[in-house]
From Swiss-Prot:
Residues 276-297 are annotated as: Disordered. Keywords: Actin capping, Actin-binding, Cytoplasm, Cytoskeleton. The gene is CAP2. This is F-actin-capping protein subunit beta. Belongs to the F-actin-capping protein beta subunit family. It comes from Debaryomyces hansenii (strain ATCC 36239 / CBS 767 / BCRC 21394 / JCM 1990 / NBRC 0083 / IGC 2968).
Length: 297
């Protein structure tokens, strides 16, 4: 009998081998196969697979504020998604008397979440050339039922960015899952798992495209006693902003300097084997257009 771990590993291995441009459809198809299996572990396996695979972010409009926000597993309850602008779920969650209410951050964390959304919206405007969408969601990590009144127990969250070029040839989704662990009254450790989902198409020629995802982790211990911070909450925002900026910078450099250079080496090797000069110039041009596509995101 195939073990649970073997099934999960096989599903993840299959996802890696399928066309990354169709990652959402591929994931849904595999989850459907798992559900149709009808085994006792089907539901758990489906949830683990969904949490292990990053898919392109979906944009939704907040019915109360009219602002767009990004949807992911971290702000989902059933088929509804919580807006960071109004702190309400849309579509409205239909709740029975015996059901638990949808999750919300504590009051103090919600206040920090509001400030974080405003701050990273400015970041998005500066670093994404005024385009795209950003959303930030925080949640309490304290397992006690009492309302959290301070951030002394730490918290977790996710920072999301999505941008698409005007002609649809380039799509960028970045997902930064964060965990904040206070080490002392004046220090905190920040753990960030950053994933980028990239899809670049050459509109002039369908023969060359680049799609896939990249994940990296970063961990730093930072001081909460900052001269520029009015309080601990502001210090957390400054530290998180610095960390996200560093992580995105590293990912962009890795994509452009490593993966695109590798793509060029592969193209050049193939051309030396079977191509001529005109073919080389044509492929160089297509590769250059893909690089420009990344730079425009």
């Amino acid at each position: 009998m195939t073990s649970y771990d073997d099934k999960l590993d096989a599903s993840l291995d299959l996802m890696r081998r399928l066309d990354p441009k169709n990652i959402t459809k591929n994931l849904n198809d595999i989850c459907t196969l798992i559900q149709n299996d009808g085994s006792e572990t089907s539901e758990e396996l489906t949830q683990d697979l969904l949490s292990s695979v990053d898919v392109p972010l979906r944009t939704q409009k907040c019915d109360e504020t009219g602002k767009e926000y990004l949807c992911c597993d971290y702000n989902r309850d059933g088929d509804s998604y919580r807006s960071p602008w109004s702190n309400k779920y849309f579509p409205v969650v239909a709740q029975d008397s015996d059901e638990l209410p949808p999750p919300f951050p504590s009051n103090i964390l919600r206040e920090l979440e509001v400030k974080a959304n405003d701050s990273f919206d400015i970041y998005r405007d500066l670093y994404y050339e005024g385009a795209g969408t950003s959303s930030v969601y925080f949640w309490d990590t304290n397992e006690e039922d009492d309302e959290q009144e301070t951030l002394d127990n730490g918290f977790a969250g996710v920072v999301l960015f999505k941008k698409e070029t005007e002609d649809g040839s380039g799509k960028w989704d970045s997902i930064h899952v964060i965990e904040v662990i206070p080490e002392a009254s004046s220090n905190a450790t920040y753990k960030v798992t950053s994933s980028v989902i990239l899809d670049l198409q050459n509109k002039k020629s369908s023969s060359l495209s680049l799609a896939g995802s990249l994940t990296r982790q970063l961990e730093l211990t930072q001081s909460l006693s900052l001269d520029s911070a009015l309080n601990v909450e502001t210090a957390h925002l400054i530290n998180l902003g610095t960390l996200i900026e560093k992580s995105e910078y590293n990912l962009r450099n890795l994509l452009q300097d490593v993966y695109f250079d590798k793509l060029r080496d592969i193209v050049m090797k193939d051309l030396r084997s079977v191509g001529d000069l005109s073919g080389k110039e044509s492929d160089d041009k297509r590769q250059s257009e893909l690089v420009k596509g990344l730079q425009s995101l």
